[in-house]
Amino acid sequence: MRLSRFFLPILKENPKEAEIVSHRLMLRAGMLRQEAAGIYAWLPLGHRVLKKIEQIVREEQNRAGAIELLMPTLQLADLWRESGRYDAYGPEMLRIADRHKRELLYGPTNEEMITEIFRAYIKSYKSLPLNLYHIQWKFRDEQRPRFGVMRGREFLMKDAYSFDVDEAGARKSYNKMFVAYLRTFARMGLKAIPMRAETGPIGGDLSHEFIVLAETGESGVYIDRDVLNLPVPDENVDYDGDLTPIIKQWTSVYAATEDVHEPARYESEVPEANRLNTRGIEVGQIFYFGTKYSDSMKANVTGPDGTDAPIHGGSYGVGVSRLLGAIIEACHDDNGIIWPEAVAPFRVTILNLKQGDAATDAACDQLYRELSAKGVDVLYDDTDQRAGAKFATADLIGIPWQIHVGPRGLAEGKVELKRRSDGARENLALADVVARLT
């Protein structure tokens, strides 16, 4: 993509309404525009990152055996009355009526609807286990939306729902999602720590939040530093095998949110040098809730013994849009964003340091064509901005690799390659650049 043809509305000044780094940088980098309190338009740069995050989430759900579908944003109020949650949710749930006075709501989550879909079609244990997921926009009418995508009212979420004939099967499904989440966040360059958490209005007695450490996080957390060094399973993990050793390894090291923190246990189990009390950002949460919804909504299957019984369920959420904020909070410096390569809007940016110079233009065009032909996402800054402004923009938007092309270097047949993450630079022959980056 040529920057001269791209829509990238960079802001020179820090927006006054932005309280945290991620919100400030997303607005400055032209990723978002606020349309109402807690509601944002996703501009091209932000949308590219959002789609890359979404795809990683999708790939890891599929790898773990979950099946994608798509449910609507609007739900019937009667479904929520059936489960007993309609009145349990407060004013954060947006309730509306259509022209026929039918009561609807803008779904904050989908346990009721997926249970209704399940009970309409699945009657026998032979169809289980089953895990269905979708990636869809949600709405929760936060009283004080703030911090950009970190606490917005409209947000993109992946929610998965597992169905099993008994508790043992449901816990296996829970473990699959636990491991899938470890892999999902690691692929995005994040160290997300699973922590025991309260279940809240979702229900059940088992839940883990996945927390990215950040001083701007909304949750206080207490961890044993050893958890920071635990290995994440690779892509060859056998989801049909026994995942218990992985789960035990990650849950035997102390890590808890402030809601379920046990001070006495923490002090007795964790050496003082290993204790870390900090803050974190929740990027996902998983729940086992047993028969909470199948009991009230009569989602039964015929078991091996021929009798009907309610299914055991779990739900598993990832805040897809929230992840952009979490990644920026964890990956930035004073100059801007530092995107991990897996989620970067572009992998490489070419900076033409003397637009209009024939040799410089030709070298940039050559690199742009050759890298694009290799399938590399390239943003070519072919604008007439001065070199300093181009450097500042490239650092702000955080593209992992910058290629600086100017007459001085080309006089020696060289261009400069800069790695955004640490500022490391190397001079390369023009002919060697494509091989270096592919």
UniProtKB/Swiss-Prot annotation:
Protein name: Proline--tRNA ligase
Entry EC no(s): 6.1.1.15
Oligomer and partners: Homodimer.
Database matches in SUPFAM superfamilies: Class II aaRS ABD-related (SSF52954), Class II aaRS and biotin synthetases (SSF55681)
Family: Belongs to the class-II aminoacyl-tRNA synthetase family. ProS type 2 subfamily.
HAMAP family from the UniProt entry: Pro_tRNA_synth_type2
Domain of life of the organism encoding this protein: Bacteria
GO cellular component entries: cytosol
The organism of origin for this protein: Rhodopseudomonas palustris (strain ATCC BAA-98 / CGA009)
Subcellular location: Cytoplasm
One Gene Ontology term of the molecular function aspect: ATP binding
Reactions that this protein is recorded to catalyse: tRNA(Pro) + L-proline + ATP = L-prolyl-tRNA(Pro) + AMP + diphosphate
Function: Catalyzes the attachment of proline to tRNA(Pro) in a two-step reaction: proline is first activated by ATP to form Pro-AMP and then transferred to the acceptor end of tRNA(Pro). Can inadvertently accommodate and process cysteine. The misacylated Cys-tRNA(Pro) is not edited by ProRS.
GO biological process: prolyl-tRNA aminoacylation
Keyword list, A-Z: Aminoacyl-tRNA synthetase, ATP-binding, Cytoplasm, Ligase, Nucleotide-binding, Protein biosynthesis
